[in-house]
Amino acid sequence: ELGTRGSVEIRYKEAAKAAGALHVDVRIERTRSGYLSLRDAKPETQTDETNFGIGVRVIVNGAWGFASAPGVNVELAKKLAITAVEMAKTSKPLSTDFVSLAPEPSYPNQKWVSAYEIDPFTVSDSEKKDRLASLSNKLLSSKSVNHTSAHTHFVKEQKYYADIYGTSTTQQRVRVQTQIEAISIGEHGFESMRTLAQPAGFGWEWMGNKNWDWDSEIAELPTLLAEKVAAPSVEPGRYDVLVHPSNLWLTIHESIGHATELDRAIGYEANYAGTSFA
């Protein structure tokens, strides 16, 4: 699928080195994302989109330069390499540190594919809809539930990396995230409760009961929702709080994770969320 990458490698390396770069690397990435949502067990939204692009990174006189664009072809790679070099030269006067990469062995022609059994993009739309609808209908059969919302998001990432030292790697990663929500509306107002399944590095097999027991969780959700509706408001005071792992991992990420992300620690933060993940 990345058949032009050999020619792309040659052109971006030649162009960047000729322009003065000591380090050059390229990333070619294709990300396909699918999304399906149901409201009260009926289809509401469905999307299937693919993003495909290339990024070239260089070091010139101790300063980083970067350029990227959608699509991939030989002339574009050459143009991006030259643009990245110019970006490095432009940012050099503002650089506070001289960037020098540590020695690293080369890893030519390496491949890695995440473990999964069923590519979600090979599963028919009707099968995906039927699974979400089945779980939704089980909730709707309870008198505690007035409405349901269900969605699944599935992604396939394919990334190729190469640098001037001979490393070339291809990787593919698949992941799925699904959430089913039960909603109660009445004199009490509006209350909801959702499944706790985390985003997972699985294929569509994640939607069976082998890796996550969806049926059992759906079966107990109406009872938990009814208890939530009947629960009194919290009175001011001191309490022991039990935090479920599905909430705690976000707490850890927001408090400790962001502070220890590499780009933030060494002053390379690109935006609010940074470009690395902890």
What residues fall within each predicted segment?
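Active-site bordering "gate/hinge" segments
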Residues: 1-278
